[in-house]
């Protein structure tokens, strides 16, 4: 445990990454309710699997908890980075092969959030 206080922007960045995961979960639920495009093929089924919503909510909860428990920040940020990277790669793969629409935007957004989470995981305060 570090006796040094974290950088002032660290809790804010953790909350932004948590909000991004919560938004991803909401988008997945709304899409499954019929407001978005239906997945086609194996890649689409993997990218739009309902378990992703729960995984994103778990990552968001871990990130929010780590704002109060700095010792948990590294593993929470790595969980966020791996989750968002895997989901984004599936989205981009889906968009490239099957459905080139707003899926590109969601996949790119996810990779940006994954980069933020990786920065948080490797940051020395």
Could you tell me what each predicted segment is?
Residues 61-75:
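Juxtamembrane helix-break-helix junctions at the cytosolic face
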Residues 111-125:
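Membrane-water interface at the C-terminal end of transmembrane alpha helices
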Residues 3, 97, 116-117:
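Charged interaction scaffolds used for protein-protein
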Residues 14, 39-56:
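A loop-to-helix transmembrane entry motif
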Residues 20, 55-60, 77-89, 105-113:
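Mid-membrane cores of alpha-helical transmembrane segments in multi-pass membrane proteins
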Residues 23-34:
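Alpha-helical transmembrane segments of multi-pass membrane proteins
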Residues 70-71, 78-106, 121-125:
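Membrane-helix boundary connector in multi-pass membrane proteins
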Residues 1-24:
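Cytosolic juxtamembrane helix and N-cap/initiation of the first transmembrane helix
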């Amino acid at each position: 445990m570090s006796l040094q206080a974290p950088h002032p922007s660290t809790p804010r960045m953790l909350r932004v990454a948590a909000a991004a995961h919560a938004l991803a979960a909401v988008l997945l639920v709304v899409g499954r309710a019929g407001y978005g495009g239906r997945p086609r093929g194996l890649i689409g089924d993997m990218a739009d699997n309902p378990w992703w919503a729960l995984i994103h909510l778990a990552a968001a909860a871990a990130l929010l908890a780590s704002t109060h428990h700095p010792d948990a920040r590294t593993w929470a940020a790595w969980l966020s980075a791996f989750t968002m990277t895997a989901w984004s790669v599936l989205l981009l793969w889906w968009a490239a092969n099957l459905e080139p629409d707003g899926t590109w935007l969601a996949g790119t957004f996810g990779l940006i959030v994954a980069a933020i989470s990786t920065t948080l995981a490797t940051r020395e305060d």
